[in-house]
A protein has these predicted regions:
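Bilobed "Venus flytrap"/periplasmic-binding protein-like clamshell domains
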Residues: 1-45, 134
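Short, charged, surface-exposed secondary-structure boundary motifs
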Residues: 16-17, 66, 88-92
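A ligand-binding cleft/hinge motif common to bilobed small-molecule-binding domains
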Residues: 24, 49, 54-74
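Periplasmic-binding protein-like
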Residues: 71-107, 120-142
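Generic non-transmembrane alpha-helical segments
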Residues: 108-118
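Tryptophan-rich aromatic "cage" segments
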Residues: 145-155
Length: 155
């Protein structure tokens, strides 16, 4: 009779990675008595804390920021496990930007982190790295694997 809160059906950390973790265990089974769409990770965590649901899945960035800056929002909660690895959220810009413009952006962002260590610490960032579609293919692989195991959506 476990109830789940996920922020949205198109969430990587809130849905895709959890589905991938559960899919090989259930194979065509429903894991949850209820699945609630919360609209965001903070709301999902609040739903668990309030007893509205028993489980949610949030990204490590959100959880880490809360540990550092709002630990009271994690009162009464604990981490049960971790998902398969996933790339970080991408920075997105226009298709019309040149390679030089993209390089300049990364240089400026990384220089800012070096020159403003307090900002880097607040954001919990060490550096910005360029990434391409190939870095995110693993997420589609996770989706396909879950579908292949008969678990196309959390239920």
């Amino acid at each position: 009779n476990t109830r789940l809160a996920l922020n949205d059906h198109d969430s990587n950390s809130g849905m895709n990675l959890l589905r991938h973790a559960l899919a090989p265990l259930g194979r065509d089974s429903a894991f949850f008595a209820e699945v609630h769409i919360s609209g965001g990770h903070l709301r999902s965590l609040a739903m668990v804390a309030a007893g509205e649901v028993e489980l949610t899945s949030v990204d490590a960035v959100t959880f880490g920021y809360l540990q550092l800056h709002a630990p009271e929002r994690l009162d009464g909660l604990r981490v049960l496990g971790r998902s398969a690895p996933s790339p970080a959220l991408p920075l997105i810009t226009s298709l019309h930007w040149s390679a030089a413009q993209r390089r300049e952006l990364f240089e400026a962002l990384n220089l800012t982190l070096i020159e403003c260590p307090h900002l880097a610490a607040t954001l919990a960032l060490k550096s910005f790295l360029p990434a391409g579609e190939e870095h995110y293919r693993i997420l589609l692989d996770y989706e396909r694997q879950a579908q292949g195991w008969g678990y196309p959506q959390l239920r």
